[in-house]
């Protein structure tokens, strides 16, 4: 990807919004590239609160002024109180400690969700990690979503595919998929398809 960007004089935007919730993985593209052709974007709303719309980016020096201008033109102001509160959290190690607690709770939620899913005959397409997982339910998840619409909302795999092809996979949020009633409803809906 980096070679293509270089060859076509393009920049890559690496959106890493869930960085604080993701397990350690391969190096970021921006790190491999030393910010020559990449713009790294992340934020704090997923780990702290959605109301704190404060993010950050790292970019090639040649792009920084244009990115600042774009930010100023598109948002006019920045919530100073939120920025100050976030700076306090960063300076005093509060974000790190908070992140550790959130990750512990997420691990417990993930474990409960995996047990529930597997006890209802589902399997994970990839090892469960981070905030989201891919569950194979064995039936077309778009049809399943329609069957469950009155009780629960699910995220069919087709929504996450460029060609919107049918899929037996659904994306689950481990933090919100721990209710046994959800998995029982999924069983009933599958049986009715």
PLM regions: where:
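PLP-dependent class I/II
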Residues: 1-193
């Amino acid at each position: 990807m980096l070679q293509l960007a270089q060859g076509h004089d393009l920049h890559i935007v690496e959106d890493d919004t869930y960085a604080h919730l993701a397990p350690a993985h391969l190096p970021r593209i921006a790190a491999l590239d030393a910010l020559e052709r990449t713009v790294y974007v992340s934020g704090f709303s997923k780990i702290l609160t959605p109301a704190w719309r404060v993010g950050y980016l790292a970019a090639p020096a040649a792009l920084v002024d244009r990115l600042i201008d774009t930010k100023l033109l598109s948002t006019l102001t920045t919530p100073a109180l939120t920025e100050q509160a976030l700076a306090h959290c960063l300076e005093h190690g509060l974000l790190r400690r908070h992140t550790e607690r959130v990750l512990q709770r997420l691990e417990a939620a993930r474990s409960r969700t995996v047990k529930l899913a597997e006890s209802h005959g589902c399997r994970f397409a990839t090892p469960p990690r981070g905030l989201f997982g891919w569950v194979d339910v064995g039936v077309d998840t778009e049809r399943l979503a329609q069957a469950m619409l009155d009780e629960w909302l699910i995220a069919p795999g087709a929504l996450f595919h460029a060609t919107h092809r049918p899929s037996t996979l659904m994306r689950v949020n481990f933090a919100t998929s721990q209710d046994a009633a959800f998995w029982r409803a999924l069983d009933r809906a599958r049986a009715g398809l």
